[in-house]
Amino acid sequence: MAEEIKNLRDEYVYKAKLAEQAERYDEMAEAMKNLVENCLDEQQPKDELSVEERNLLSVAYKNAVGARRASWRIISSVEQKELSKQHMQNKALAAEYRQKVEEELNKICHDILQLLTDKLIPKTSDSESKVFYYKMKGDYYRYISEFSGEEGKKQAADQAQESYQKATETAEGHSPATHPIRLGLALNYSVFFYEILNLPQQACEMAKRAFDDAITEFDNVSEDSYKDSTLIMQLLRDNLTLWTSDLQADQQQQEGGEKPAEQADQ
């Protein structure tokens, strides 16, 4: 039986890798979902995903959702343009199409959230995996909050903040400031403050603290994580530059200056 499970697990991993190469991310996500649901032994607390499997799961769902988030932004923009032109029939068609994309987004996000909540987080024994999964949980609740109505947005935002906070507390207690997962968490949590909670000052403070802490410890960064760490640090710095500029522009606008530039999509 154990050998059968191992073979099935290897098969799902291979299918996921094959789907990734073919850029068929829905099928990649399906393979990894099947692995989590069918191959993790409920009786073995330490039977959890390997780092490779964990990364495959993350890549699959990130890309499946990412394509639809991009579609949602485009369709929402078209819908607003049709409204501004008073083309109400076209606006209604765009709204119907947007809702279709929202249904797809909602299903994918809730699929991965259910896996995280019911299967992965309860079986996690090490702090790195715990940070990774709570960060993922925060990310997918953040995505839900992007397209939900007021009540749904608040509920999703509360869940996202709770998950990001749990990840942050674990990361700060167990991971160096240069660790890519800890840096990626700070990046996404700060974006959450900026885009979802509309708290630019707190977003800047969080991003700056993560960047400064990493710089302080940078001499000790491991060779394995050097490339990933420096990439995320650059993204933190880019966001800081943009957000600081926007804050200054907002201040100028309040004083009668020019309107600030739009926030770039993450």
UniProtKB/Swiss-Prot annotation:
<dbReference type="InterPro" id="IPR023410">
    <property type="entry name" value="14-3-3_domain"/>
</dbReference>
<comment type="similarity">
    <text>Belongs to the 14-3-3 family.</text>
</comment>
<feature type="compositionally biased region" description="Polar residues">
    <location>
        <begin position="158"/>
        <end position="168"/>
    </location>
</feature>
<dbReference type="InterPro" id="IPR023409">
    <property type="entry name" value="14-3-3_CS"/>
</dbReference>
<dbReference type="InterPro" id="IPR000308">
    <property type="entry name" value="14-3-3"/>
</dbReference>
<protein>
    <recommendedName>
        <fullName>14-3-3 protein homolog</fullName>
    </recommendedName>
</protein>
<dbReference type="Pfam" id="PF00244">
    <property type="entry name" value="14-3-3"/>
</dbReference>
<feature type="region of interest" description="Disordered">
    <location>
        <begin position="154"/>
        <end position="177"/>
    </location>
</feature>
<dbReference type="InterPro" id="IPR036815">
    <property type="entry name" value="14-3-3_dom_sf"/>
</dbReference>
